[in-house]
Curated annotation (Swiss-Prot):
Residues in compartment: Lumenal: 25-504
Keyword Glycoprotein set for record: yes
Family: Belongs to the glycosyltransferase 31 family.
Protein's name in the database: UDP-GalNAc:beta-1,3-N-acetylgalactosaminyltransferase 2
Membrane topology, Cytoplasmic segments: 1-3
Glycosylated residues (UniProt): N117, N176
Record EC number: 2.4.1.313
Example of a GO MF term: acetylgalactosaminyltransferase activity
Subcellular location(s) per record: Golgi apparatus membrane; Endoplasmic reticulum
Pathway connected to this protein: Protein modification; protein glycosylation
Length: 504
C-alpha cells in the first residue's frame, strides 16, 4: 500500500498544479466574489511572475469590442510578432467587471449610474419651489445682503416667477431687492426680477412674486438664484435645511454646499433661501410614457447586460488580454478603474514601467521604446507625458468637477498616453483605497501626483488632440475605421502622417 501511495502522490500533485494553472488563466466572472489576485498570491506567496520592461494598460468601455479588435489587429499584433519587443511588453485592456444596471434613458446623466428617480410628477400646474414652516422664528432679518441657492434640473421645466420674502414687521412691501437667475459659470443673468415699494409684484402665501420671461430649462441645466438687497439692511432669509423643497416628483434637485454642489467659495453670497420661484414641468405626456415603459426597459436592459457579460467572458477567454476590475463601468468611475488596475499590476506582474492609454488611441510602441532609449528615461519617481498646466476646472457638463475646490488643476498628463515608473505605480496601488477620485482619470492623476512630486518629462509627441504628427507616440479620439487606416498607412510608409500611398 505504501508503494502505491508513493506512486500516486506525484500524479495527484501534478494534476492539482495543472488545474490550478488552468484556473489562473481562466477569465474572471464579472459577478464572481471569489478570491482576488491578492488572495491568490497569498495562497502561493513564492509564485514567480514573468518580468516585463513595460506593462501597457488600455482603458476600455465594456461595449467597445470593435475598438479592442482593431487594436489587436494593428499595433498589438505588430507587438506580438516583433522579434525583440514581444517578450518585453504586456498589454491588458482595463474593463469594469459590472455594467450599469440603469438604462441610459433612466439615468440622471449619461456619465454616471444614478437613477433618475422621478415618481408621481406634478403636471399641468404651477409649483412653488419651497414650502416654509409656520413658525416665524425660522425666518430672520440677517446682515447678509446677498443670498443664493443652486439647483439642477433633472427633467425640463419652465420658471414662471421669481419671489422674495417680505418682512412681517413692515406694513406692505418696503424693500428694494433684486432677484437674478444665472446659469452656472455664466456671468450674465438669464433673467432678473426687481422688487421695490411701488413695484412689489403679487403676494402668494409668504412671498412676493414677479413674472419673468419664460425659457425652457433643459435636463442637466444647473443654475443659481441670487437675492441681492439694494438697501443697507440685510435680507429676510432662511437656512436651506429649514425649508421643504417641492421637487415636482423629482424633476429638480436643490444643491447644498458639501452635498455634491459647488464648493461654498464659488457660490455668490451666503447659501440660503431669501425667497423662491414658481415653475411648471414641461413635456408631461412624454414623461408619463417614459415612466410607464420603464419596467420593461429595465428588464430588457438587464437581459442585454447578461448577453454583454457572456460576450466579454468569451472575448477574454479567446484573447487572454483583459483585466476585469471591480467597479461599475461608467465614465465617472474611470479613475477607480485605473486605481484598481494599478493594484492588479503590482499584485500580478513584475515590470519596470507602466504605459497608460485609451482604446481609441493610436500608439506607436516601437517609437516609445526608441524614445526611452534616446532620453534615458529610467530610474525612480518619473512621469513622462504631455502636460496640461493651469487647466481650468469645469463646473458643468461631462467634465464637471464639484469635489476639487481650486479654480485650476495641478499639472496632469493628457490621457492619450503617458509612462510612469514602477515606484509610482506601487505608491498608487498601496494607497488606492484611500485616494479620492475626481471627475476624470487624467486630472485625478495630476491631483494624486501633486502629493509626491514626481520628475515630469514633458514630451509633445504624446498628442493631446486628434491630429497626426510625424514621430507621434500617441494620438486620441479615433474611430475603429480611422485607427485601421492610420496603421495601414504606417505599415505602407513608416509614417502615417506623410504617406502618399493609396490605401485600398
Amino acid at each position: 500500500m505504501r508503494n502505491w501511495l508513493v506512486l500516486l502522490c506525484p500524479c495527484v500533485l501534478g494534476a492539482a498544479l495543472h488545474l490550478w494553472h488552468l484556473w489562473l488563466r481562466s477569465p474572471p466572472d464579472p459577478h464572481n466574489t471569489g478570491p482576488s489576485a491578492a488572495d491568490q498570491s497569498a495562497l502561493f506567496p513564492h509564485w514567480k511572475f514573468s518580468h516585463y520592461d513595460v506593462v501597457v494598460g488600455v482603458l476600455s468601455a465594456r461595449n467597445n469590442h470593435e475598438l479592442r479588435n482593431v487594436i489587436r489587429n494593428t499595433w498589438l499584433k505588430n507587438l506580438l510578432h516583433h522579434p525583440t519587443l514581444s517578450q518585453r511588453v504586456l498589454v491588458k485592456f482595463i474593463i469594469g467587471a459590472r455594467g450599469c444596471e440603469v438604462p441610459v434613458e433612466d439615468r440622471e446623466d449619461p456619465y454616471s449610474c444614478r437613477l433618475l428617480n422621478i415618481t408621481n410628477p406634478v403636471l399641468n400646474q404651477e409649483i412653488e419651489a419651497f414650502s416654509f414652516p409656520e413658525d416665524a422664528s425660522s425666518s430672520r432679518l440677517s446682515e447678509d445682503r446677498v443670498v443664493s441657492v443652486s439647483f439642477r434640473v433633472l427633467y425640463p421645466i419652465v420658471i414662471t416667477s421669481l419671489g422674495v420674502f417680505y418682512d412681517a414687521s413692515d406694513v406692505g412691501f418696503q424693500r428694494n431687492i433684486t432677484v437674478k437667475l444665472y446659469q452656472t459659470e455664466q456671468e450674465e443673468a438669464l433673467f432678473i426680477a426687481r422688487f421695490s415699494p411701488p413695484s412689489c409684484g403679487v403676494q402668494v402665501n409668504k412671498l412676493w412674486y414677479k413674472p419673468v420671461e419664460q425659457f425652457i430649462l433643459p435636463e442637466s441645466f444647473e443654475g443659481t438664484i441670487v437675492w441681492e438687497s439694494q438697501d443697507l439692511h440685510g435680507l429676510v432669509s432662511r437656512n436651506l435645511h429649514r425649508v421643504t423643497v417641492n421637487d415636482g416628483g423629482g424633476v429638480l434637485r436643490v444643491l447644498a454646499a458639501g452635498e455634491g454642489a459647488l464648493p461654498h467659495e464659488f457660490m455668490e453670497g451666503v447659501e440660503g433661501v431669501a425667497g423662491g420661484f414658481i415653475y411648471t414641468v414641461q413635456e408631461g405626456d412624454a414623461l408619463l410614457r417614459s415612466l410607464y415603459s420603464r419596467p420593461q426597459r429595465l428588464a430588457d436592459h438587464i437581459q442585454d447586460l447578461q448577453v454583454e457579460d457572456a460576450l466579454l467572458q468569451e472575448e477574454s477567454s479567446v484573447h487572454d488580454d483583459i483585466v476585469f476590475v471591480d467597479v461599475v463601468d461608467t465614465y465617472r468611475n474611470v479613475p477607480a478603474k485605473l486605481l484598481n488596475f494599478y493594484r492588479w499590476t503590482v499584485e500580478s506582474t513584475s515590470f519596470d514601467l507602466l504605459l497608460k492609454t485609451d482604446d481609441d488611441c493610436y500608439i506607436d510602441l516601437e517609437a516609445v521604446f526608441n524614445r526611452i532609449a534616446q532620453k534615458n528615461l529610467d530610474g525612480p519617481n518619473f512621469w513622462w507625458g504631455n502636460f496640461r498646466l493651469n487647466w481650468a476646472v469645469d463646473r458643468t457638463g461631462k467634465w464637471q468637477e464639484l469635489e476639487y475646490p481650486s479654480p485650476a488643476y495641478p499639472a496632469f498628463a493628457c490621457g492619450s498616453g503617458y509612462v510612469i515608473s514602477k515606484d509610482i505605480v506601487d505608491w498608487l496601488a498601496g494607497n488606492s483605497r484611500r485616494l479620492k477620485t475626481y471627475q476624470g482619470e487624467d486630472v485625478s492623476m495630476g491631483i494624486w501626483m501633486a502629493a509626491i512630486g514626481p520628475k515630469r518629462h514633458q514630451d509633445s509627441l504624446w498628442l493631446c488632440e486628434k491630429t497626426c504628427e510625424t514621430g507621434m507616440l500617441s494620438s486620441p479620439q479615433y474611430s475603429p475605421e480611422e485607427l485601421s487606416k492610420l496603421w495601414e498607412l504606417k505599415e505602407l510608409c513608416g509614417d502615417p502622417c506623410q504617406c502618399e500611398a493609396k490605401v485600398r
